Design a protein with these regions (language model features):
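Short beta-strand-loop/turn "lid" adjacent to the catalytic site in phosphate-handling enzymes
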Residues: 36-83, 102-104, 111-119
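Short, hinge-like loop/turn segments at secondary-structure boundaries
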Residues: 8, 66, 121-124
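N-terminal phosphate-binding loop and adjacent alpha-helix
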Residues: 2-41, 69-80
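Electropositive phosphate-/nucleotide-binding environments in soluble metabolic enzymes
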Residues: 22-26, 30, 42, 63, ...
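Phosphate-binding/catalytic loop of phosphoryl-transfer enzymes
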Residues: 84-174
Length: 174
């Protein structure tokens, strides 16, 4: 299901596909590109941002994507095998189709990298921590957004300790 709304919330495009019909990454990007061409009002796409689940120890902030960064991110597939390949597929596809289009990755693990190193450690031998075994934390983009908005939504909660739950296909607590 594809749905696009304007700044006022009015639906400007919607498409349903039959049950079980799968576009795949290439089909989805093709549909989105076609929609943007017909609804851009003369504007052009100047960049693409991606949510990427795992930045490992290498990426604790958004990163401009190039072949070297994508190669780095591929090494984290074993740490997030259900997500990372699907995060990287549209990046690679767009790199092949539009190599001059800037792309940026924002990492779900980055928010938790701001914790003290001790909080990232498991109660395991230090050699394992030094080899990269740690609490990476997930759903960080969601938590980062909530942390940035909490003061304006609930100043009293923002002034103290707050527990936030991320519940969906995956679940976490921060």
């Amino acid at each position: 299901h594809f749905k696009a709304v304007d700044a006022n919330g009015a639906v400007i495009g919607e498409q349903f596909w039959t049950d079980g019909e799968m576009l795949g990454h290439e089909g989805a990007i093709g549909h989105l590109s076609g929609f943007l061409r017909t609804h851009s009002g003369g504007h052009r796409l100047v960049g693409v941002g991606h949510r990427v689940v795992h930045g490992g120890l290498l990426y604790a902030a958004p990163a401009r994507l190039d072949a070297a960064v994508v190669s780095d991110l591929e090494q984290f597939i074993p740490l997030a095998p259900l997500h990372q390949p699907h995060n990287l597929a549209p990046i690679k596809l767009l790199m092949a189709q539009q190599p001059d289009l800037p792309q940026v990755a924002c990492f779900d693990t980055a928010f938790h990298r701001t914790q003290p190193e001790l909080a990232q450690m498991f109660a395991l031998p230090v050699e394992l921590h030094e080899a990269g075994v740690r609490r990476y934390g997930f759903h960080g983009l969601s938590y980062e957004y909530i942390a940035s908005r909490l003061q304006s939504i609930d100043p009293q909660a923002a002034a103290g300790r707050t527990v936030v739950l991320h519940l969906g296909n995956g679940a976490s607590m921060c």
